Amino acid sequence: MAQSFTGKKRIRKSFGRIPEAVQMPNLIEVQRSSYEQFLQRETRPGLRRDEGVEAVFKSVFPIKDFNERAVLEYVSYEFEEPKYDVEECIQRDMTFAAPLKVKLRLIVFETEEETGARSVKDIKEQDVYMGDIPLMTDKGTFIVNGTERVIVSQMHRSPGVFFDHDKGKTHASGKLLFAARVIPYRGSWLDFEFDAKDIVYVRIDRRRKLPATTFLYALGMDGEEILTTFYDVVPFEKRSGGWATPYKPERWRGVKPEFPLVDADTGEEVAPAGTKITARQAKKFADGGLKTLLLAPEALTGRYLARDAVNMATGEIYAEAGDELDVTSIQALADQGFSTIDVLDIDHVTVGAYMRNTLRVDKNAIREDALFDIYRVMRPGEPPTVEAAEAMFKSLFFDAERYDLSSVGRVKMNMRLEQDVSDEVRILRKEDVLAVLKVLVGLRDGRGEIDDIDNLGNRRVRSVGELLENQYRVGLLRMERAIKERMSSVDIDTVMPHDLINAKPAAAAVREFFGSSQLSQFMDQTNPLSEITHKRRLSALGPGGLTRERAGFEVRDVHPTHYGRICPIETPEGPNIGLINSLATHARVNKYGFIESPYRRVKDGKPQDEVVYMSAMEESKHVIAQSNIKVAEGEIVEDLVPGRINGEPTLLQKETVDLMDVSPRQVVSVAAALIPFLENDDANRALMGSNMQRQAVPLVQSDAPLVGTGMEAVVARDSGAVVIAKRTGVVEQIDGTRIVIRATEETDPARSGVDIYRMSKFQRSNQSTCINQRPLVKVGDRIVAGDIIADGPSTELGELALGRNALVAFMPWNGYNFEDSILISERIVRDDVFTSIHIEEFEVMARDTKLGPEEITRDIPNVGEEALRNLDEAGIVAIGAEVQPGDILVGKVTPKGESPMTPEEKLLRAIFGEKASDVRDTSLRLPPGVAGTIVDVRVFNRHGVDKDERALAIERAEIDRLGKDRDDEFAILNRNISGRLKELLIGKVALSGPKGLSRGEITAEGLAQVASGLWWQIALEDEKAMGELESLRRLFDENRKRLDRRFEDKVDKLQRGDELPPGVMKMVKVFVAVKRKLQPGDKMAGRHGNKGVISRILPIEDMPFLADGTHVDVVLNPLGVPSRMNVGQIFETHLGWACANLGKQITNLLEDWQQGGQKQALVERLTEIYGPDEELPDTEEGLVELARNLGKGVPIATPVFDGARMDDIEGHLEMAGVNKSGQSILFDGLTGEQFKRPVTVGYIYMLKLHHLVDDKIHARSIGPYSLVTQQPLGGKAQFGGQRFGEMEVWALEAYGAAYTLQEMLTVKSDDVAGRTKVYESIVRGDDTFEAGIPESFNVLVKEMRSLGLNVELENS
């Protein structure tokens, strides 16, 4: 297997046995592709598909004015370049967005007065600015007001038709009441439902119900048409001796006739009355030639007429369609000369009379009445007119502007109703309504199945593009009303398109969506995994989705169709469980929004290379085998293989299988696929494990896990945390902040031949963790496009590294690991093993106040020189300064209100001018609990405000950096082009040239005599070569101009003032890096849900140690394993132990070789570990680097559901030369004695979680009080106190601690006068106090008085 640049440096051995049939898709493709479909930025205007922005404009335009004198048409749109790039937007608190320009065409008509004919009078086209649309960064995020945000995809019920029943809950009898619901993408919902009496009703938008036939009348049907649509018609012909009817076997199966069946043609009795006719007999009668039955007249009683019985001559109606026949009415019809009576084929067993009964219940009989009824339900209180009712009914379901099923809805409807209608037809049709009612009635008759709404075939995903499209449509519709009004109010002949358009509503809708939608979330940026997971999240909440309170158990539960689409493990614990999910590793979203999973085709028991993606609906028709079935020589080995049909697990014959899974990890999400031995963990703990990995803090020095799953490199690559080479090339220059690579395979002359990659250094993430990138390459390295050239936070050598490998022993230690507590060695603190850096951001603004402008200055009243030691002349803290809580970061003074002055002050003021006392100190100080180093300061000035010295210094440094980038890129470009020019010139004949170059054939020596900048002056004899020289010259000049232009643009942006909030003159941001070592109270966890809090840090010498004197790092409680059933951690411990010991062996072999031993021993050991198929480095340098990187341990991958087995682990332990049981003899560090029995010791990958005790610990002496109750506020953020609640009061009462209780309830809480006095007495050195009345008592008295109860205190 070909290794990547970083993969060669440390090869990870995999235990996976199942080959991957398909490469894992890019993990943030969901976000990227959805937004690209929305914007279609790269597609030329004429070629754009009808989706996204294009679809929105086409649906809103053309806009006509009220008199139809003018039409505003949409032509096309294009995006301009964004004003600021991503970095600048983050620094300046701006939105990364591109201006949208739309080309509109205004057509003005004129009408001839005589003929009324319309002709085009004028056509005007113009580009109109329609606001800014935020752009997605390469990482799938949006920068909104300077913060990175993610738009989470939403799961909602797919548009279409759904059939369901009430599970017998509505009616006391437990009868199932069936219902059908037509859900459009936008528009009114249409419900059909049965009641307990089997009458079918219709509801529009969940309003009052009407008989379903009212809706059919409104569609233009009449009673007879309704009946013949829903029921077959059976003709009965009058003959002597009874009525004859055609014989159909299926109608008589299982029937016990009350009268004899007689063959109408022969007159002989076929079946006697009262005997049951079996299916075989019914078929036998037909085979015997029975075509017509003669039935007694009583056979017609209870049947329903199919058509009106009308006397054609007089028009008299004897009976109406749907009337029930009895003996008298049959006789009457016969007497009137009706020789044939058509009745409905209703037997009340297989076909019920529901629609006929509904028709009878319906009071309406004509269309107008039905329309009026619907109008009254939809708009109660308004008197209906025929036109209004007609228009309202049409707009509900048959108007494309108001009702949209969407292509998804039409496709779903076609599948459910077995129709074939184009997905362009997005409104309801009469046929759809009838088909829905037929299926509903069929369900009531026992035919067909109801739908499962939790099936992923009935739920779809709305990603970023679609969510924003809907929001933008809302904005444009708001704009449309304004445009119509403006078109009517202005002189249409002189106006231009941009005069009609105010783009604010559209821009506001987009801004509102990104700023305040429930689905637009502040990105979880704790580590690269949490970023990826956030982008792959699916939420059932949000606008148009579910709410936590209403979501039942079924919606949250795992469904068989989740297999390979949604992870069954990763979901939050708590109220959102099951409502927020994660996409499975291989899943993707198709054009209709359904989640698809990949499968390999299988033909005749042979797996094929072809991979197909299937949605839950398509998959239900297939027989699918698992990916772990044995395949030898391209054929499935076993005859019976495990698999599933329609989601149900079963054993399958290999010949029946037509699909198989592509990979065992396709079932789970990215986070769950990072847990080794996931198959050995209980699901609840696996859930915690996958959730806690997202909370791991990036450490100062990360280690990739010894025991991984092979997903680590994929996650690091796709997360955007590492730097990836865009093009193949050679590393030219490198330092800690940037890498310069010269592209070697670039053919496009318009593109630069140089790539400069800037490292992020100590940047603050959304969660205040530290983003820091480190180069992995050195000058001269050859890089291939796609290689990882720099590590980011929580990555090491291009692999995800969330924590560190720690030497762990499972044993109790003096009670310090009670209840999951963790005992750690002081070595971990000393060597900064779990030390992390957190960057806090503080900002201060100088505003223009009513009393005068605030000022950022070093000159602060009543502050000593000691407090100003870290500030520069401008009053801003210096970078690199060590700061403690309470230190001044930025000095600021605010003007005070004028107070009356004494005569002395007036005199002094007159003598010395302005005095310092009319300003107060409002400096930015470091809050309690934060101490660290200043890593960055940014100063922002308003336009037209003079920059201070500090702002100018920052600006100069930035310009120098940009200049260096430009110069380096130019130097490489110059070298590159000079090389090509030299190749072109050597061997050619020069006609003329610069001074120092002789005519004739050009040689390398001759060229060396002339400066390369003058080579352009050479004139060649060969015209073709001269043409090439000219094109090279042009390329060189263009590239130089491009570099200069880019540099000038950037400098111009720097020197221009910043856009600050209103009233702000200047803003300073200070970034403080805080180093957090591990300490008691910090939370740690493994990857298997094994979490705990550090209880004690023990001196190294007191920790238990191994026979070779190595002290363990961590002691965990063995009782944490059995009840929690996460045995994966024990497997990990054993395998980690084997890996580490193999690493020691390799280090020893490397040392032997470097001290004159044999290289072969090392190579043989590596081959034994990795197997003969693994490519080892072919150079000695590469081999040494690999061996050094393996010194800490040989990293292995044990993929989920396809990992190392018991015998693999034992084999590795043997190979590593340690006990096969994985247990070791340990000695007590305190006494030096051996423990009684062997202890499980090994390496576990431990994470430090973002629940640090430093962020939680908090103390208050005096602080802010609540306005009404005068009690201290609560919480660390408010600098609040600790609540002394009801139960705590009981405790003090129980102990009889009266004085303590009194001071808790009065002077320490809300006795305002008392607490002031206590403060004064403490200052005087007096320790007595007197308690007064708590303020909350006064609040209670006021409350009671507001209820009219007078409560007064009587002093007795």
From Swiss-Prot:
CDD domains: RNA_pol_B_RPB2. One of its GO terms (biological process) is DNA-templated transcription. It catalyses: RNA(n) + a ribonucleoside 5'-triphosphate = RNA(n+1) + diphosphate. Keywords: DNA-directed RNA polymerase, Nucleotidyltransferase, Transcription, Transferase. Pfam families: RNA_pol_Rpb2_1 (PF04563), RNA_pol_Rpb2_2 (PF04561), RNA_pol_Rpb2_3 (PF04565), RNA_pol_Rpb2_45 (PF10385), RNA_pol_Rpb2_6 (PF00562), RNA_pol_Rpb2_7 (PF04560). GO terms for molecular function: DNA binding; DNA-directed RNA polymerase activity; ribonucleoside binding. Its EC number is 2.7.7.6. GO terms for cellular component: DNA-directed RNA polymerase complex. DNA-dependent RNA polymerase catalyzes the transcription of DNA into RNA using the four ribonucleoside triphosphates as substrates. The RNAP catalytic core consists of 2 alpha, 1 beta, 1 beta' and 1 omega subunit. When a sigma factor is associated with the core the holoenzyme is formed, which can initiate transcription. Belongs to the RNA polymerase beta chain family. This is DNA-directed RNA polymerase subunit beta. It comes from Caulobacter vibrioides (strain NA1000 / CB15N).
